[in-house]
């Protein structure tokens, strides 16, 4: 079982927005939500036209890595139980992690209209 911590990059069954199914994908652990739940941010290898996406490259990892340059998507958050986390693949350095947190806070402060 994964022992998550803020800044960890883990593999988790990430739900589609319509909850029709899930896909195993990486996610950045943002915060402990209590009772074994964690707030996660979706990570993708596709550079969608998401202006909020934050590039994750090998240089941004304190440990581990992803197979390819990837993108954290601060507008794609969800809460998951620790039991759904399959593995930890890395841990971000402070700077990229803080960029993600700042983007989430900005998005929420703007009421989602950023």
For every predicted segment, state its role.
Residues 18-20, 68:
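Coiled-coil-like amphipathic alpha-helices with heptad-repeat character
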Residues 20-23, 29-63:
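Compact nucleic-acid interaction/catalytic patches
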Residues 62-114:
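C-terminal terminal-subdomain/extension
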């Amino acid at each position: 079982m994964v022992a998550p911590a803020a800044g960890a990059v883990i593999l988790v069954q990430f739900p589609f927005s319509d909850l029709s199914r899930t896909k195993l994908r990486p996610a950045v652990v943002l915060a402990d939500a209590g009772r074994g739940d964690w707030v996660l941010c979706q990570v993708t290898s596709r550079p969608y036209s998401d202006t909020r996406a934050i590039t994750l490259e090998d240089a941004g990892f304190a440990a581990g890595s992803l197979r390819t340059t990837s993108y954290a998507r601060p507008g794609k958050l969800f809460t998951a139980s620790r039991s759904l986390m399959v593995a930890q693949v890395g841990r971000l350095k402070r700077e990229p992690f803080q960029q993600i947190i700042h983007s989430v806070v900005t998005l929420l402060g703007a009421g989602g209209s950023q």
